[in-house]
Amino acid sequence: GYYDAYYLKALRTKALIKQAFDKAFAKYDMILAPAAPSTAPKVGSSLQDPLKMYLSDVYTAGVNLAGLPAISVPAGKDRNGMPVGLQFIGDCFKEKKIIQAAYAYEKIRGVFPMAYQKEGK
């Protein structure tokens, strides 16, 4: 029934995702990746296209399925002034390492004003 058709397939897929991350962490301490496949939408615009809104977090889904710690930080703006995010992904129980790396990155990158703030204030 549904257990075999969906749940077991989902568990197998989850295991494959975790194995892929394990293989990467055998070589690397941390993975840096975009936080989303596109820049942030303008306020209210994502409600007009629910599929686009759903797909905007696709880059974080595998990390969550694998049960890995990650943190996303502002990385800059696109040519239209919309924010772009950077994701720091760590192996299991490496939260301290990714938080330290994200903090160091933010110190080097400098202040990133919120949308309601003016640049330099």
Language-model regions: role of each:
Residues 5-9, 39-57:
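Short, surface-exposed loop/helix-turn segments at secondary-structure junctions
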Residues 36:
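Short glycine-/small-residue-rich Rossmann-like dinucleotide-binding loops
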Residues 59-62:
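Alpha-helical transmembrane segments of multi-pass membrane proteins
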